Amino acid sequence: MKKKNWLVMSLFISSMAFAVSSCSDDNNNDNTVDDSAMDPVKTALINDYIDLTVLPTYDDMKAKVWDLMDAVTVMFESETATQDQLNAVCAAWRNAREPWELSEGFLYGPAANYSIDPSLDSWPLDQVNIEALLNSSQNIAEQTFAQDNSGFHTLEYLIFLNGNPRDISSISSRQKEYIYYVTKKLLDDTVRLWAEWHGEKAISDQRDAELIENDEITIAGV
């Protein structure tokens, strides 16, 4: 599984930290520590951390971002979107944001290596370009969104005002379209992040598999 690759990286970092600590603390005694004897212990600890913290957090995030995508799709496909639909989108955004914020404690590995972190969470936004696209005639569906024009904060900007759901009457058809496609990119990034940690063999959900195939998401690993 791909997670073992991230485990090796984490183990290396922790080993270096242990070695530095040992050298600084034990300069004046003759006792030696066989660092290799610690490897199974450190490996077990890191495995537990990944299995009990990292992977469940990304599992939760993926499920909640799918919920967000579903709520956005309902609003996007409605001929006349309602305030209740927008409120549901805002509630789903808040739910999806929670596990992402928890994951900020372990943004090494795929989140950093493949620039998924800035794609999901860049701040500040490029509001000038966001508004320029909204006010243009460009096809939003064909856009390759820049990091500061996508992710959680861009979606937040589009659906909230002063911390509350916007009035649905203020959401134009172009904004609704932008909301849909920026959420779709957020979902792509989330599923890729999940798959990079779990490995391709763990992809069993049909919707995940179809998304990865249809959107040509590459699961790179290391």
PLM region descriptions:
Residues 1-21:
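Sec-dependent bacterial lipoprotein signal peptides
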Residues 15-45:
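Bacterial Sec-dependent N-terminal signal peptides
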Residues 33-222:
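Mature extracytoplasmic or organellar-lumen-exposed domains after removal of signal/transit peptides
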